[in-house]
Regions:
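Conserved structural motif at the start of ABC-family nucleotide-binding domains
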Residues: 4-6, 18-21
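Helix-to-loop junction immediately C-terminal to a conserved catalytic motif
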Residues: 50
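Conserved ABC transporter NBD signature motif
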Residues: 58-70, 122
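The feature captures the beta-strand-to-loop junction immediately N-terminal to the Walker
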Residues: 35-37
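Conserved ABC ATPase "signature" region
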Residues: 110-129
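ABC nucleotide-binding domain signature
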Residues: 33, 72-79, 92, 96
Length: 130
């Protein structure tokens, strides 16, 4: 059984079809590249996988669960974020920005900070947390 399975996935913004009949399965340790032209639906597909959007039809399963239920086990680093690049920011704060359930004004719980530190530890970057 694949860790991520997408079956007959369709998605439309209003009446504009963005993704049509997507079928895909892969194991979590596999490498996967998603590429295509601007407006081709790459970011939309990622948002569907994260449970930030709901498909018009079809199913997505991540380790046998819906994206909403699997969300706590996923991380996401957006391509663009709205920050002033000259403003000092720590590595830990950058990791916290990747939380799916973002906080207003950057107030994160102790649990969220611990979760971010664990993520940094998994990739050997805890000493850079700041």
């Amino acid at each position: 059984m694949a860790d991520v399975t997408i079956r007959n996935l369709n998605f439309a913004y209003e009446k504009r079809e963005i993704l049509k009949d997507i079928n895909l399965s892969y194991e979590l340790r596999d490498f996967l590249a998603i590429f295509g032209p601007n407006g081709g639906g790459k970011s939309t597909l990622l948002k569907l996988l994260l449970g930030l959007l709901r498909p018009s039809s079809g199913t997505i399963e991540i380790v046998g669960r819906s994206p909403a239920l699997a969300r706590a086990q996923m991380g996401y680093v957006p391509q663009f974020i709205a920050i002033n690049k000259s403003f000092p920011i720590s590595v830990l704060e950058v990791v916290l920005m990747g939380l799916i359930d973002k906080k207003i004004f950057g107030f994160y719980s102790k649990s969220e900070r611990e979760q971010a530190m664990q993520a940094l530890e998994r990739v050997g970057m805890q000493s850079l947390a700041g």
